[in-house]
Amino acid sequence: TLNAPLVSAQKFDPALLLQAITGPDREVSDFIRDPIRKPVQVLDFLGIEPGMIILDLYAAGGYYTFIFSKAIGPEGVVYAQNTVRGRQFVEDRQDITQGQALDKKIEQGKLSNVVQIIRPLTNLGLQPNSLDAVMVAQVLHDYYNPDPERALNMLKQLKVYLKPGGVIGITDHVGIAQYDNNELHRMTIAQATVKCLHSSFTMPSQCKKG
């Protein structure tokens, strides 16, 4: 089986990353999500570069873990975090658990720069100021909707691990204020923005939408 190589350019190259994530070592079930999730544009917007140290919070089946691994190259590290319980959830579009899906991605993709963390956020075992970036993909609403303070506490905990100037990337299902976003598993951009600002994060001049 041919595997697409890890990107090794000194700076982020969207064309190289696109080539790396369209190889035969990637799951088709992940590939078909790309038109909606736009991962190359997301990483470009976040300023991801080779050699970075990144935490993929609740990596689940590893959609972003795989992409980050290819983007940061052999000198970088991706920490793919899941809880024991989370690893037991069924992976979308597959008849395996999320933990099994992630294990499979790491093995088949030869993702030697991925380190799994099977611990809760409150006990990650990482050093403060050690991360260049944290990815929170389709997760923040799960913290916010039961109790907005949980989302605030989560963001504050993550900020401790970021280096000065580090970035947190948040992607989520966009909710509409008058709808039941808890039932729909969504949250509004305004809700996410307020919690980020209250966590002492600074926001870019324009958040990407869509």
Where are these regions (language model features)?
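Conserved class I S-adenosyl-L-methionine
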Residues: 49-60
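A short SAM/SAH-binding and catalytic strip from SAM-dependent methyltransferases
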Residues: 120-121, 132-149
